Amino acid sequence: MEQKYSLLSHNTFGIDVSAACFLEYASVDELRGLIGSGRVTSPYLHIGGGSNLLFTKDYEGTILHSRIGGVEVVAETDDDIVVRVGAGVVWDDFVDYCVQRHWHGVENLSLIPGEVGASAVQNIGAYGVEVKDLIVRVETLNIEGKEHVYDVTECGYSYRDSIFKRPENKSVFVTYVSFRLSKREHYTLDYGTIRRELEKYPGVTLDVVRRVIIAIREEKLPDPRVMGNAGSFFMNPIVGREQFEALQAEYPQMPFYEIDTDRVKIPAGWMIDQCGWKGKALGPAAVHDKQALVLVNRGGAKGADVIALSDAVRASVRAKFGIDIHPEVNFI
């Protein structure tokens, strides 16, 4: 237990704030003990790697952080394998663990920052893969010390969303996540960038795909250890067919991804770039010069600086395209 604990190393934006109280635990029993001791005082917030948070001020309450580790095989057939993973496991360590064992499914999610528990809360995704399609169940403990296991069908997954993000589930803490992975070769290589990079290699393997994904991400995205950021700051908007066709008529070069016959996803980064924001700064916060979807802390930025930039970018996109883009990052 730490009082007035600095959160600088617990948020990838590098915002220098503190928590009134900081508690870590390494098992479900430890978490239950903390709850039973009365040390988890309201307000409270459970964080993972802090890679999807923007702290706007000091947190006048209790921050909880899981250090539950371990990867355990709980079921296996000739075709697939189910693993139960502690919520405190670093996500990319888990991806590497799977790739080394030739388990297919998570390789496209390489180098995404954060921890396993948060992956299930946020429904992380990249390059045609969403974690909801791999999750089997999510184990939780609530603020009253009660355990509950959610089948994936109960998790309410949609684009970067789940029931765990709802205000009424703020008191539900993820402890373990189980994933089903394939033992058979199964790749998702539909994104053009991936296919182009794979041409540099003599063949496709899990290790090669992971290396390609890492190379693509490192080229586009700044290292938060060097320049504070939370990865993609905005969600890609999904619009109806009629609105999409009107936009396409005006901007025939606009990239897009078909969701279904009625809905189309438009890259927010492209729209931000078209508004002239790529590489531009507003005080100590800026739009990254290689990926307009990413907002960065150039040094010494406060949460309010990032929000001011976010608001300005959103206003520009709304004025030019008539589309509201929404932050993927959670403001605290």
Curated annotation (Swiss-Prot):
<dbReference type="InterPro" id="IPR016169">
    <property type="entry name" value="FAD-bd_PCMH_sub2"/>
</dbReference>
<dbReference type="GO" id="GO:0051301">
    <property type="term" value="P:cell division"/>
</dbReference>
<keyword id="KW-0285">Flavoprotein</keyword>
<dbReference type="InterPro" id="IPR036318">
    <property type="entry name" value="FAD-bd_PCMH-like_sf"/>
</dbReference>
<keyword id="KW-0573">Peptidoglycan synthesis</keyword>
<dbReference type="InterPro" id="IPR016166">
    <property type="entry name" value="FAD-bd_PCMH"/>
</dbReference>
<dbReference type="GO" id="GO:0071949">
    <property type="term" value="F:FAD binding"/>
</dbReference>
<dbReference type="GO" id="GO:0008762">
    <property type="term" value="F:UDP-N-acetylmuramate dehydrogenase activity"/>
</dbReference>
<comment type="similarity">
    <text>Belongs to the MurB family.</text>
</comment>
<keyword id="KW-0131">Cell cycle</keyword>
<keyword id="KW-0560">Oxidoreductase</keyword>
<dbReference type="GO" id="GO:0005829">
    <property type="term" value="C:cytosol"/>
</dbReference>
<feature type="active site">
    <location>
        <position position="328"/>
    </location>
</feature>
<protein>
    <recommendedName>
        <fullName>UDP-N-acetylenolpyruvoylglucosamine reductase</fullName>
        <ecNumber>1.3.1.98</ecNumber>
    </recommendedName>
</protein>
<dbReference type="InterPro" id="IPR016167">
    <property type="entry name" value="FAD-bd_PCMH_sub1"/>
</dbReference>
<dbReference type="Pfam" id="PF02873">
    <property type="entry name" value="MurB_C"/>
</dbReference>
<dbReference type="InterPro" id="IPR006094">
    <property type="entry name" value="Oxid_FAD_bind_N"/>
</dbReference>
<dbReference type="InterPro" id="IPR011601">
    <property type="entry name" value="MurB_C"/>
</dbReference>
<dbReference type="InterPro" id="IPR036635">
    <property type="entry name" value="MurB_C_sf"/>
</dbReference>
<feature type="domain" description="FAD-binding PCMH-type">
    <location>
        <begin position="15"/>
        <end position="184"/>
    </location>
</feature>
<feature type="active site" description="Proton donor">
    <location>
        <position position="232"/>
    </location>
</feature>
<comment type="pathway">
    <text>Cell wall biogenesis; peptidoglycan biosynthesis.</text>
</comment>
<dbReference type="GO" id="GO:0009252">
    <property type="term" value="P:peptidoglycan biosynthetic process"/>
</dbReference>
<keyword id="KW-0274">FAD</keyword>
<dbReference type="GO" id="GO:0008360">
    <property type="term" value="P:regulation of cell shape"/>
</dbReference>
<feature type="active site">
    <location>
        <position position="160"/>
    </location>
</feature>
<keyword id="KW-0963">Cytoplasm</keyword>
<comment type="function">
    <text>Cell wall formation.</text>
</comment>
<dbReference type="Pfam" id="PF01565">
    <property type="entry name" value="FAD_binding_4"/>
</dbReference>
<keyword id="KW-0521">NADP</keyword>
<keyword id="KW-0133">Cell shape</keyword>
<dbReference type="InterPro" id="IPR003170">
    <property type="entry name" value="MurB"/>
</dbReference>
<keyword id="KW-0961">Cell wall biogenesis/degradation</keyword>
<keyword id="KW-0132">Cell division</keyword>
<dbReference type="GO" id="GO:0071555">
    <property type="term" value="P:cell wall organization"/>
</dbReference>
